[in-house]
Amino acid sequence: MTAFLDTSVLLAGLIDFGPQSGPAQSIMHAVVERRLPKVSTAWHCCLEFYSVATRLPSEFRLTPADGALLLEEEVFARLTVHDLPAADRLRLLQAAAQDGTAGGRIYDAHIAEVARAADAGVIVTDNRRHFLAALRHGIRVETPTEFLRTIKTRRS
């Protein structure tokens, strides 16, 4: 099963925001320790990580150089980074229009479609409701805490 990490998991997994970062950090530790063999994300999530991480409040903010380095060493070196295949782009827009997807929700629809194209079995996110459209493709949507429970159960 391929786990697909959303931006929220990358952020909390790589930047310590306190106790709420714990589950995402546990997932990233499992990636480092190779306990999760198939983990991926979207190129868009990498861009979103960089955008958010370099404009956080000063106590958490990364410099642009540190943001790029963290992505290089922790994401590109350990995860498979996918983009939406060109052949799927128009279909995404058509489906979004048909579903009434408006505003910034198009970005979540894009990420969900990248996860589908990457054959993800689960999207791990702190924003479950943003990815409910993925359910129609048979992709589970779990919070980091739920995902940790799932992988613990599978190992037992």
Predicted features by range, described:
Residues M1-T41, L56-L69, R149-S156:
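Short, well-structured N-terminal submotif of metal-dependent ribonuclease cores
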Residues H130-G138:
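Short loop/helix-cap segments at secondary-structure boundaries that form the rim of catalytic
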Residues S8-V9, H44, H110, R129, ...:
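Alpha-helix/helix-capping structural signal
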Residues K38, T80, G138-R140:
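Conserved beta-strand segments of alpha/beta enzyme cores
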Residues D6, G104-R105, N127, I139-S156:
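Histidine- and aromatic-rich ligand-binding microenvironments
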Residues M1-A3, G121-V122, G138:
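The start of beta-strands in P-loop NTPase/AAA+ ATPase cores
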Residues A30, H44, Y50-A95:
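Active-site-proximal, substrate-binding regions of enzyme catalytic domains
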Residues T80-V122, D126-R128, R155-S156:
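Active-site neighborhoods of divalent-metal-dependent phosphate/nucleic-acid chemistry enzymes
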